[in-house]
Amino acid sequence: DKNHVGPTPYSLVPLFCELYGGDYSAKLLSAFSKMFTNFIRSEGFTLGVEDILVTDDANAKRREVMARTAKVGDECAAKGVGIKGEFDEETLKHKLEACHRASAAVPKRRMDLDRGYKGALNPATNDINSACLPTGLIKKFPRNNLQLMVNTGAKGSSVNTMQISCLLGQIELEGKRPPIMISGKSLPSFRPYDTLPRAGGFIDGRFMTGIQPQEFFFHCMAGREG
């Protein structure tokens, strides 16, 4: 793979160069190029939908985690704004509004709120990833061509496979969750000071089955920043 013949320390070509010199190393690379070209002509490489599908058991586990995650919003928000014990929705909303109004003067309040959400949502992201990849795939490595591409270093990364088959996860801008507007909404389609994780940029959708317009907008925000 790329680690053996690519420009990495202790790979085949640098060692060959040290032993036999640059001229023979150039001939070796030319020989590899011709050999790989002829191989691709007779053994075409591609990937299809079958390479990204996950089993029914993995999908069931994923839905279970998603349902559990959707309910942690109130608890995370209450913890982030310092509410202890019992609370009602109106009290929580007033606390969140006060935190929002004071966040410009006291940024730590917003940071504490974001940290609380991330701490609760990261385990959910990890649970979904471990359920779907790689054991949850219908086609396993090395028969799975997408996994083969990533693991050999040809193209793509584990993040790409995660976003295709599992979820996109928490979207962040400069290390923070997407900001909310002066109205208290992160996007016009959400309620003011909505505590749902998805209102704060947590995307439990995946590219394989599609994502919602709001999730796509959050994803575009992070992509443009990058």
Language model features: what each stretch is:
Residues 1-101, 111, 147-150, 154-226:
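Feature marking long nucleic-acid-engaging regions of large polymerase/nuclease enzymes
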Residues 100-145:
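Internal maturation/activation junctions in enzymes
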